[in-house]
């Protein structure tokens, strides 16, 4: 089904460079220096747990009972000045085969088999999954977060045999926080998947992340949130907002940094599309493990880091 002519009339005005935004709304980009890819350490670790668990399942040599549906959550304790201190809790829920059968048809036998399955999965998470996860972490400050008092919650509801769309309804757009920053930063509410780059729900969110990532990489701030707002049919954003959470390393105010963002980055939808090459067929990777912070991610940090750093070094001298 094609886009409504009423919407398309406002977006496609015949001037390709000034193509209007495909919808109204606010989009957020966030970055911090907690990890090498400028993502919150909580979400980065949760994604690493899931990709590693998938690798183990696909290899088919260990934890051979694994099935595709799984999710994770990592809780980290922070200091008062927002610095990660230690991992408090790791949750891993994974679908699995009925790999331990009950001795008979009684309820007691079924409960005993279910309990043994969960205990085996818990043991394998600690002895197989976690060592492989930690072996992939190169950052000493992230490794230092692991400790002997971590609470591991593995399949906390018990057995998990029925999964995927058969076990729960709906797929697209249900996990917009997992797709972005795991609760840090902000979110305008619009899902990404299923939308082309004329929809600023997707393209402007990628652009805001691109800006935030380059700002942190350039040393402007240890943490930054970039908010863009658009009106349907209008090319330029109606608002650009920046929040450095009091962790800026430059003399400029957040408002002055926002003005610098307007100067440095062309935020018209067509310009975003060109800068980030959003017409290339590269979206398959975003179907799982989030849209941001990927090694092979859509939104990559490019040479903008040097340009941002140069612009900031003159009017906003380091303090």
Describe the predicted segments one by one:
Residues 27, 73-75, 91-93, 151-154, ...:
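Structured core elements
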Residues 6, 16, 182, 266, ...:
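Non-catalytic terminal and connector segments of soluble metabolic enzymes
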Residues 1-162, 288, 293-297:
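Glycine-rich, mobile lid/loop segments that gate access to catalytic sites or pores
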Residues 39, 111, 115, 119, ...:
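Hydrophobic alpha-helical scaffolding
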Residues 305-312:
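Conserved small/polar residues in nucleotide/adenosyl-binding loops
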Residues 179, 186-267:
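Hydrophobic alpha-helical bundle architecture
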Residues 4-9, 18, 23, 174, ...:
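Gly/Pro-rich active-site capping loops and adjacent beta-alpha segments
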Residues 157-173, 229-256, 282-301:
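Short glycine/threonine-rich loop-to-helix capping motif typified by GTGT followed
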